[in-house]
């Protein structure tokens, strides 16, 4: 079907357009043209002056809408996550599977493959976060499962690199030495949950790691003028990094500093769990065998350890604009274009451009998402 989205403020890759229209033909953006040049008789959808942008891409999502991928590992769970995401403008995501036994990881890979055979341009492959981490920076991950990789598991993951998009590995875990193998298999290696020194973290990036998982969280900090830790290595390297902009995981001042240093390598992620997009009456849920409590937007376990976020991508953009003072157009790029580049899919997703997949989000000036387009299909919230 061919139609045009009209009467909107269009955020393209680098421009903000008014009095333009986006023509969608099938699943593709056919053109972005002045509205006055639309052909007579084309079907139109009036967006009533609201913002139109490429759909947001969340590179770290454990769960949402009341479900968790680790605890309900199924195609149906991923479908619930996708439908929940659409309500906040997120059209694509990396389902994140955290530290678990090998058989559970293999099951997650199998389910991811089934999902990808059924759906395209939505869940974009698996993010395996652990178990090859640091005990000292485990966060909510279960320490009894944190380990080095076995040769058999390394081969399995490499053989399934077509459905595993990203892996988080601690820089000091010996598993990091297999980075060239993972990269050759098409897997992006991200440094995270790491207590490494600056030097060890830099070595991980030299081995081929190109991303860092939730900057500042579960990684050794800059503790003095001499000890720079993983945070210092990330800020001093030309790698992408995700950052959680909920005001709980890190101070907004840190986000402001990070943005000045990292520029277009800083990607907004949610790291959200079941509470995101769930009914307000949800007070607790199970995550990898632990009871997680929700209070005032904060998710924590019985030891008061932060267990993930309850924020959406749209809320994150709002926070970036209102509390970090990042211009809206740039906060949007941090949520679609830069994540797309980070995982190498910006040739088809991440911006409103001719020839790209029509995955789009429409939201009001007060950050209320009123509709999305996925693979060219319009859906009103």
Swiss-Prot record:
Top-level EC class: hydrolase
EC annotation from Swiss-Prot or TrEMBL: 3.5.1.25
Keyword Metal-binding on entry: yes
Binding site for a divalent metal cation: 129, 193, 214
NCBIfam families noted in UniProt: nagA (TIGR00221), PRK11170.1 (NF008371)
General function of this protein: Involved in the first committed step in the biosynthesis of amino-sugar-nucleotides. Catalyzes the hydrolysis of the N-acetyl group of N-acetylglucosamine-6-phosphate (GlcNAc-6-P) to yield glucosamine 6-phosphate and acetate.
Entry protein name: N-acetylglucosamine-6-phosphate deacetylase
């Amino acid at each position: 079907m061919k139609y045009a989205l009209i009467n909107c403020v269009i955020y393209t890759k680098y421009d903000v357009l008014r009095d333009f229209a986006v023509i969608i033909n099938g699943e593709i953006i056919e053109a972005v043209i002045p509205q006055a040049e639309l052909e007579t008789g084309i079907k139109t959808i009036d967006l009533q002056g609201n913002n139109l942008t490429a759909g947001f891409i969340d590179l770290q999502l454990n769960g949402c809408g009341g479900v968790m991928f680790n605890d309900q590992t199924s195609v149906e769970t991923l479908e619930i996550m996708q439908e929940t995401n659409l309500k906040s403008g997120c059209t694509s995501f990396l389902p994140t599977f955290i530290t678990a036994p090998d058989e559970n990881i293999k099951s997650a890979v199998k389910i991811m493959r089934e999902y990808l055979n059924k759906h395209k341009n939505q869940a974009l492959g698996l993010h395996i976060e652990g178990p090859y981490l640091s005990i000292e920076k485990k966060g909510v991950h279960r320490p009894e499962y944190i380990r080095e990789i076995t040769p058999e598991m390394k081969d399995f993951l490499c053989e399934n690199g077509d459905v595993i998009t990203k892996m988080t590995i601690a820089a000091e875990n010996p598993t990091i030495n297999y980075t060239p193998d993972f990269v050759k298999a098409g897997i992006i290696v991200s440094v995270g949950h790491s207590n490494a020194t600056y030097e060890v973290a830099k070595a991980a990036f030299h081995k081929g790691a190109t991303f860092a998982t939730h900057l500042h969280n579960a990684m050794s900090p800059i503790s003095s003028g001499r000890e720079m830790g993983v945070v210092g290595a990330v800020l001093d390297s030309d790698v992408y990094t995700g950052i959680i902009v909920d005001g709980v995981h890190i101070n907004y001042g840190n986000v402001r500093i990070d943005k000045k240093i990292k520029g277009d390598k800083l990607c907004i992620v949610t790291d959200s769990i079941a509470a995101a997009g769930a009914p307000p009456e949800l007070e607790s849920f199970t995550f990898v065998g632990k009871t997680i409590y929700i209070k005032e937007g904060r998710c924590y376990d019985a030891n008061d350890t932060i267990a993930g976020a309850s924020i959406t991508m749209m809320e994150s953009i709002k926070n970036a604009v209102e509390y970090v003072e990042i211009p809206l157009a740039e906060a949007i790029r941090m949520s679609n274009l830069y994540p797309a580049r980070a995982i190498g899919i910006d040739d088809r997703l991440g911006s409103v451009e001719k020839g790209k997949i029509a995955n789009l989000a429409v939201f009001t000036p007060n950050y209320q998402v009123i509709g999305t387009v996925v693979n060219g299909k319009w859906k009103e919230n």
